[in-house]
Swiss-Prot record:
EC number(s) per entry: 2.1.1.159
Protein name per UniProt: Probable 7-methylxanthine methyltransferase PCS2
One GO term of the biological process aspect: methylation
Residues under site feature: Involved in substrate discrimination: 149, 221, 265, 313, 328
Length: 365
């Protein structure tokens, strides 16, 4: 089985279950938060006169969907606006697109050339470079980045939480793949501890790369509740665990594979994120809020259509890490079972999706 950093990516290509075809919700969230990004660019220009020449920005965990196009276009548009306001001749925008090496950079750049870069306008020249690697470590030289953006990536962990087996080697989260109502307290504690460790590494790395007064705009999946086992956090993972358990009962998956698998992801609360940032001490929090949106599948009146669409979207972002544990050959049966479970469960409403947006400025000195 591959390590998390080798198996964590969204479904590739442009097929029915690809991330490129199933990232409309992420695009909606990105578009909603663009005013915050626009304000961040505006603030950068008010802080540093040298930005009138060039701005270095990075989109961390960019995946291969259209969100990156929106981010680059927004930054470029704001720079063009500042160029006109300040009566400068030209500005340059250097954008780095980062994700783990398994990301579908081919699909990303194929769409990028026609949608964003194209012919550089007279006011802003835009240059785009791919940077494969883990954002939990260093990626760039010291004091080289003015702006960091990330959408729906920082909640992914470097590994499954440590300490989820007993001294006797027994699984402590038996039958589940994430925190659930039946998980013992040690599971919740292990997930928070792993997120604390990983997010601290993320902040430490960025604190060296971002210039003084530089800015980060981070959007991540989270929760408004203090309880990490609430359905707003666990809905998809609970139903996937149920689908896997069905295949275990049919003898298609070893029970041990289910009992020893824990998803390397954590949806934190606002308080948990705030505490980690403040403890780290490298950045000030300029803005922070949580907001809820209905799952787009809830717009469908037919529960069968609603369930199938929900399952397809979930497959686009979960299949690579799930297949790494349970095997590629079982994925069609697994997600078919998942779809049936989703449809039967959709007699109840799909929980709203909670996001956290965080704007951080690097502390000077």
């Amino acid at each position: 089985m591959k390590e998390v950093k080798e198996a964590l990516f969204m479904n590739k290509g442009e097929g029915e279950s690809s991330y490129a075809q199933n990232s409309s919700f992420t695009e909606t969230v990105t578009s909603m938060t663009m005013p915050v990004l626009e304000n961040a660019v505006e603030t950068l220009f008010s802080k540093d006169f040298h930005l009138l020449q060039a701005l270095n920005a990075v989109d961390l965990g960019c995946a291969a969907g259209p969100t990156t196009f929106t981010v680059i276009s927004t930054i470029k548009k704001m720079m063009e606006k500042k160029c006109r306001e300040l009566n400068c001749q030209t500005l340059e925008l250097q954008v780095y697109l980062n994700d783990l090496p398994g990301n579908d950079f081919n699909t990303l750049f194929k769409g990028l050339s026609s949608k964003v870069v194209g012919n550089n306008c007279e006011e802003v020249s835009c240059y785009v470079v791919g940077v494969p690697g883990s954002f939990h470590g260093r990626l760039f030289p010291r004091n080289s980045l003015h702006l960091v953006h990330s959408c729906y990536s920082v909640h992914w962990l470097t590994q499954a939480p440590k300490g989820l087996t007993s001294k006797e080697g027994l699984a402590l989260n038996k039958g589940k793949i994430y925190i659930s109502k039946t998980s013992p307290p040690v599971v919740r504690e292990a997930y928070l501890s792993q997120f604390h460790e990983d997010f601290t590494m993320f902040l430490n790395s960025r604190s060296q790369e971002v210039v003084p007064n530089g800015c980060m705009v981070l959007i991540l999946r989270g929760r408004l509740s203090s309880d990490p086992s609430d359905m707003e956090s666990c809905f998809t993972w609970e139903l996937l665990a149920a689908a896997i358990a069905e295949l275990v009962s049919q003898g298609l998956i070893d029970e041990d594979k289910l009992d020893t698998f824990n998803v390397p992801s954590y949806f934190p609360s606002l308080e948990e994120v705030k505490d980690i940032v403040e403890r780290n001490g490298s950045f000030t929090i300029d803005h922070m809020e949580g907001f809820e949106l209905d799952s787009p599948q809830m717009q469908e009146n037919d529960k069968w259509v609603r369930g199938e669409k929900f399952a397809t979207v979930a497959r686009a972002s979960t299949e690579p890490i799930i297949s790494n544990q349970f095997g590629h050959e079982i994925m069609d049966k697994l997600y078919e079972k998942f779809t049936h479970i989703v449809i039967s469960d959709l007699e109840a409403k799909i929980p709203k999706v909670t996001s956290i947006i965080l704007v951080l400025s690097k502390i000077v000195g």
